[in-house]
């Protein structure tokens, strides 16, 4: 290679990901270009994605084998179990893999992983960036996936070779991108943040005005400015009193209606973004308004699990069964997340309900144990008599008139 070849060799000034973001970025009414990277710079969006993907990544996930109609147990020894619970691929832990896949699912509406097979067994799951995958449905209704490699070549994979997590979809083929649907909200949040930064950079926030009854010479005005800056400027001097001399008066400048509206817009954007992701506002630091999910943090947390996380959990469980388990095992093996850890804060209310259900014969002990993912015990299929009918079960109804009371 000649010495001058370094000058002739083209150099990449931007990365491929940056070019992809530029092409995919959407112009908004606010003027902001919303891309995956710019969306993650919005604090509310970052927190929502982090909360949901973090929950999916940390919740216990296991394969459960159905022993019989009642008994369930971990599918110990099943090859896929190690992939899901120990090591999905050579460089990721299970929580890292699920967290990344869920983040892609939230932003792009789809998450993909290539299955590495040895015989009939999945031995690794290789995550694929959604922007490199084109999902198509054939005339036979089977899916196929065209994946663009880092060298620019495209490889086509059959449905049986890909794990596909699909968000809410209108065509049943690909999930809808949250990033595309909330680009106006994200654009407004980005522009509001930028406007605030420029406001502080240009120093347009005035604390007040000092009025002098006379006329100050340029030198006197300069000395007054320097004196005020030395004594009152900076965070360490915040709150210090100003000593007005020679008849001077201090008039504070109140927050203008425009500034107040700017602050209100920032608050509104947090609620709007939280609504897109289904995250309770208090979980992203927006506590100014109440919620209809309950008056307490505990009730709001349960609502988050019930109305948001359960949707994604079901997507994971059913996609694992469809794409990773052989059809011959569909009746015997299930993928299950354990959300009990997120609901432990309501243990008092949950067990109080169980006690009432047991007392009134609604549940048997084994049915309660099943709700808690516990195996049945001997003698646990008994239904207890309600308290006010104890000893009456099995007796013929009496024809005697009911007793009456007299005043």
Give short role names for the model-derived ranges.
Residues 1-262, 266-268, 272-275, 279, ...:
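Structured, contiguous alpha/beta core segments that scaffold functional sites
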Residues 106, 203, 221-224, 266, ...:
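Active-site-proximal structural scaffolding
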Residues 241, 281-292, 318-331:
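Short acidic alpha-helical/loop segments enriched in Asp/Glu that coordinate divalent cations
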Residues 247-251, 331-334, 343-346:
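A short alpha-helix capping/helix-coil boundary motif
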Residues 278, 313-317, 321-329, 359, ...:
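Hydrophobic alpha-helix feature that most strongly marks membrane-spanning transmembrane helices
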Residues 291, 333-341, 371-375:
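Small/polar glycine-rich anion-binding or flexible loop at a beta-alpha turn
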Residues 299-330, 334, 384-407:
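Long, compositionally biased
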Residues 339-347, 351, 357-359:
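Non-transmembrane, aqueous-exposed alpha-helical and coiled segments at domain scale
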């Amino acid at each position: 290679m000649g010495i001058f070849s370094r000058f002739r060799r083209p150099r990449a000034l931007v990365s491929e990901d940056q070019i992809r973001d530029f092409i995919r970025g959407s112009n908004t009414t606010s003027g902001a270009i919303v891309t995956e990277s710019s969306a993650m710079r919005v604090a509310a969006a970052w927190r929502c994605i982090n909360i949901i993907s973090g929950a999916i990544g940390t919740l216990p996930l296991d394969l459960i084998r159905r022993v019989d109609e009642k008994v369930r147990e971990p599918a110990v020894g099943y090859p896929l179990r190690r992939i899901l619970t120990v090591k999905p691929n050579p460089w990721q832990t299970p929580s890292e893999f699920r967290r990344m896949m869920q983040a892609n699912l939230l932003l792009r509406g789809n998450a993909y992983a290539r299955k590495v097979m040895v015989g009939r067994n999945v031995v690794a799951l290789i995550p694929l960036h959604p922007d490199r995958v084109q999902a198509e449905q054939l005339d036979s209704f089977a899916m196929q996936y065209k994946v663009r490699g880092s060298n620019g070549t495209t490889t086509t994979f059959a449905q049986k070779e890909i794990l596909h997590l699909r968000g809410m979809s209108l065509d049943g083929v690909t999930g809808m991108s949250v990033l595309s649907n909330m680009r106006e909200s994200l654009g407004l949040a980005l522009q509001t943040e930028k406007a605030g930064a420029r406001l502080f950079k240009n120093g347009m926030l005035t604390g007040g005005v000092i009025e002098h009854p006379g006329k100050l010479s340029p030198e006197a005005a300069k000395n007054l400015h320097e004196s005020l800056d030395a004594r009152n400027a900076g965070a360490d001097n915040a709150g210090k009193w100003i000593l007005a001399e020679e008849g001077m008066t201090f008039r504070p400048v109140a927050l203008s209606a425009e500034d107040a509206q700017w602050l209100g817009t920032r608050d509104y954007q947090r609620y709007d973004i939280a609504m897109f992701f289904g995250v309770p506002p208090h979980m992203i630091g927006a506590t100014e308004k109440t919620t209809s999910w309950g008056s307490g943090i505990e009730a709001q947390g349960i609502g988050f699990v019930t109305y948001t996380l359960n949707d994604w959990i079901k997507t994971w469980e059913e996609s694992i069964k469809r794409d990773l388990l052989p059809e011959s095992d569909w009746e015997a093996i299930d993928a299950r997340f354990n959300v009990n850890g997120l609901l432990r804060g309501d243990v008092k209310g949950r067990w109080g309900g169980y006690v009432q259900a047991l007392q009134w014969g609604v549940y048997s002990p084994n049915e309660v144990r099943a709700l808690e993912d516990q195996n049945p015990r001997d003698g646990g299929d008994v239904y207890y008599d309600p308290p006010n009918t104890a000893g009456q079960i099995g007796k013929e109804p009496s024809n005697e008139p009911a007793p009456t009371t007299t005043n």
